[in-house]
Amino acid sequence: MNVTELPYNKFIGIKRAKSSEYLLELDESPDYLNHLGNTHAGAQLSLAEAASGEYLLKLFKDSSDKLIPVVRRLESKFKKPANGKIFARAKSSPLALEIFKEELRLKGRSLIRIEVIIEDSNQVIIMTAFVEWYVQNVIDSTSI
């Protein structure tokens, strides 16, 4: 799967970041402006959700077709007005990853909370978010 090819992400223009420092980016566009002339919160949240999905795909690059991930919750904090191109990176703690993988192995489902940082082209943090994903293994109907 490629998150940049999902219809909504493609429609708004989310792309893989050119810099290896980030996962994804969203170009500046007058279409993304709010009533104050800054990048709309919805555009920032869309980038955050997509980046968390990209992070999850990278974690499970060899088995992503055997998993069903769904966003369960998204919490965000807007820190500064966003102007221009914006960039996203994501991470989760090693302990959270370990617990997530073990629970997924044992129960066939688990939750993981991914932190996303959105920055502008001056590397100023404009938004942080936590995206919680519910992930379950695909049930193989041939084994039933």
Q: Residues of each region from the PLM?
A:
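N-terminal intrinsically disordered, cationic/polar leader segments
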Residues: 1, 5-11, 128
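Catalytic strand-loop segment that frames the active site of acyl-thioester-processing enzymes
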Residues: 7-39
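Hydrophobic residues on conserved beta-strands that form the core of alpha/beta folds
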Residues: 13-16, 71-73, 113, 128
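Hot-dog-fold acyl-thioester-processing enzymes
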Residues: 27-57, 65-68
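HotDog/MaoC-like acyl-thioester-processing domains
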Residues: 82-83, 93-144
